[in-house]
UniProtKB/Swiss-Prot annotation:
One of its GO terms (molecular function) is 3-dehydroquinate dehydratase activity. Its EC number is 4.2.1.10. This is 3-dehydroquinate dehydratase. Pathway: Metabolic intermediate biosynthesis; chorismate biosynthesis; chorismate from D-erythrose 4-phosphate and phosphoenolpyruvate: step 3/7. The active site is at Y22 (proton acceptor), H99 (proton donor). GO terms for biological process: amino acid biosynthetic process; aromatic amino acid family biosynthetic process; chorismate biosynthetic process; quinate catabolic process. Keywords: Amino-acid biosynthesis, Aromatic amino acid biosynthesis, Lyase. The record marks R17 as: Transition state stabilizer.
Length: 160
């Protein structure tokens, strides 16, 4: 299995930007922790960060056929981007949305996610640990998909 982690605008500034909201952990530290968790589960993991909406859309589209699931922190674009929402819909695979801060305790414009309705789930407000939670969520989804495929194969064999 392979997972792509897509980071949106200003995530590269973690540990520097608004530490009272986002904490002191840098993006690279989050990625390192995720690499370790993925390695223990024998799952490949890749990372991508961009401050540009079109580059995020391109990366989401590139996931089709190359990864099994996506973790995305679209950051501010989660609240505004129909293009990112449409790209997530188009790839038809498990996508989990992450927000480091609890967006529901923040400004009103941050309280609605355009992408949440097309994601398998959202992890909001758990700080950097939210990425680990999202990864565990994808592992659970992968297990369910594999169990379903095994049951289908068994049913097909029984019908032959």
């Amino acid at each position: 299995m392979k997972v792509m982690v897509i980071q949106g605008p200003n995530i590269n500034m973690l540990g520097v930007r608004e530490t009272h909201i986002y904490g002191n952990m840098k993006m690279e530290d989050i990625h390192e922790q995720m690499k370790q968790a993925a390695k223990q589960a024998n799952v490949e993991i890749e990372f991508f960060q961009s401050n540009f909406e079109g580059e995020l859309v391109d990366k989401i589209q590139e996931c089709l056929g190359s990864v099994d699931g996506v973790i995305i922190n679209a950051a501010a674009y989660a609240h505004t981007s129909i293009a990112i929402r449409d790209a997530i819909t188009a790839i038809n695979m498990p996508v989990i949305e992450v927000h480091i801060s609890n967006t529901y305790r923040r400004e009103e414009f941050r309280q609605k996610s355009m992408i949440a309705p097309v994601c398998a789930g959202s992890v909001v407000g758990f700080g950097p640990f939210g990425y680990h939670m999202a990864l565990m969520g994808l592992f659970q989804i992968f297990d369910q998909i594999n169990a379903y495929k095994a049951a289908q194969a068994k049913a097909q064999q029984a019908n032959q």
